[in-house]
Amino acid sequence: MNKANSLEEWIDAMRMRSIISFNGVFADRKDNIFFLHNSSSPLRKEGIDWKNIIDGTRSDLVWNEYVDFEEIPQIRNPSSGWIASTNQDPFKVTDANDNLNPADYSPTLGLQTRMTNRAYRSIELFTKYEKIGEKEFDAIKFDNRYSEQSRSYKYIANLFDREFETKELNYGIDVLKRWNLATDFENTSAALGVCVLSSEWISEQGQR
C-alpha cells in the first residue's frame, strides 16, 4: 500500500486481501479519491437468511470461496469530491447522490449498516460546505459535537418528555435539553450529557 505510486497500484495492493476488515480510503495529488469497504465475505447460497441459525446438515450451504474483490462496495471519484469513512454503513460514505445503492449488492455479503456519531457528523459537515479550505477542514477535523441523528442523542431525547419525582432529576433533564451537544471544555452541560451517554455506549458494545 505505502509503495503504491498511483491509484491503480494501490488497488492492486488491496486486491491481495492481506489486511481485511479495515476500510480503505485513498487520495492522491491528481485529485483521485477512492473508498473500499475492505471486507472478505464468503460466497454464500442466495435465498437463505444467513443472520439466523443455518441447517448444519445441508452440504449445499457449506461455502468454500470468497466474493470477488470487484463485488465488494467501492467508490471512485464521487462528484461530491469527498469521502468520509468512520466504520459505518458502506452505503453512506459521501453525498447521497453519489452513494452506492444497497439493492445492487447481495444480502449474503452481511454488510454492516451501523452508523456512528462520527459518521453522521462527518457527512453533516462535509455537505454543509460548497468548498472546503484550511479553515473549514480544521473545523471538521476538530468538531466535538454529537449529531441529532446519532443513537447517542436519541437515547437522551427519550428522556425529554418524562416527568420524574425529584427536583434533582427534573433539573438534570432541563440541563440535557439545553445542551447544544458540544463537548468543549467550557460546556457545563457536557459532563452530564456524556455521563448519561456512557450507558448507551456500553449497551451498544454488548457489554451490558
Positions of predicted regions on the chain:
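Alpha/propeptide regions of enzymes that mature by internal proteolysis
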Residues: 1-16, 122
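Short alpha-helical segments and helix-capping/turn motifs at coil-helix boundaries
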Residues: 7-11, 19-21, 64-71
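Long, compositionally biased non-active-site segments enriched in small/hydrophobic residues and glycine
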Residues: 28-208
